[in-house]
Amino acid sequence: MKGSIWMIGDVQGCCAPLEQLLAHPDLAGDPDARFWFAGDLVNRGPQSLASLRRIIGLGERAVAVLGNHDLHLLAAAAGVRKPSKSDTIGEILQAPDADDLVDWLRHRPLAHFEQGHLLVHAGVLAKWDVAKTLALAGEVQEALRGPNWQKALQKMYGNEPVHWKEHHKGGKRMRVIINALTRIRLCTPAGHMEFATKVPPGAWPAGLMPWFDVPGRATRDITVVFGHWSTLGLLLRPDVICLDTGCVWGGSLSALRLQDRKLVQIKCSQFQDPLAD
């Protein structure tokens, strides 16, 4: 199937499985194939720098949306946050071409829509349709690509506000957009984000549900493709696709062909303990 789009889950610095995936006959055999990356290209895995270079090397064949770990790298580059012990982004920050790598990353989108599929890292708020999602993502993209991008990143940390209001401005507006697109998992029935609860899928308390099950979600008529939720794992529904299958935790790196949902998975060695941090 020539000219296919392969949608790929969280790489998180696991370059060896990424190389195996790209070398798989179904992917490597199509010189016109394109690759969608669901964010979190770097961090936690052993080869963040190599992973980033590999994806950049794909040129226009790759579409990569920003994930929370990618934004964390940008914040570290901006001096807004210091890397933690479990981070594996130091080699990127110390690379001789670090400025070029960071510049490439901060010019990535937070949302991409094509052929009825909306690609984001974590999810969308129930009130947002595709047009609204792309417009709000565009606001953050403009800030990250601008001359004051370091200052913009200072505003993104925090869990509030938990729901969308059109009159939000400044830091509040940026936080709710970034949190929805790169951090969301659980919501209330009213669509308010909830970040404190960390339980296995299906064990969430009454009054909470996955963001994609909030009643009346405005994107239910298209397919939202996301990663971010490794404990949820592979999820294939007509309206949502989750592709984070826990590569860095010893799961697999997954690619799904958009046109027919053919699945290719590469088994990964465990690099970090998901319960350790």
Swiss-Prot record:
The keyword Hydrolase applies. It catalyses: P(1),P(4)-bis(5'-adenosyl) tetraphosphate + H2O = 2 ADP + 2 H(+). The keyword Ribosomal protein does not apply. InterPro entries: ApaH (IPR004617), Calcineurin-like_PHP_ApaH (IPR004843), Metallo-depent_PP-like (IPR029052). CDD domains: MPP_ApaH. SUPFAM superfamilies: Metallo-dependent phosphatases. Keywords: Hydrolase. GO terms for molecular function: bis(5'-nucleosyl)-tetraphosphatase (symmetrical) activity. It is an enzyme of class 3 (hydrolase). Its EC number is 3.6.1.41. Belongs to the Ap4A hydrolase family. PANTHER family: CYTOCHROME C5, PTHR40942. Hydrolyzes diadenosine 5',5'''-P1,P4-tetraphosphate to yield ADP. This is Bis(5'-nucleosyl)-tetraphosphatase, symmetrical. It comes from Bordetella petrii (strain ATCC BAA-461 / DSM 12804 / CCUG 43448).
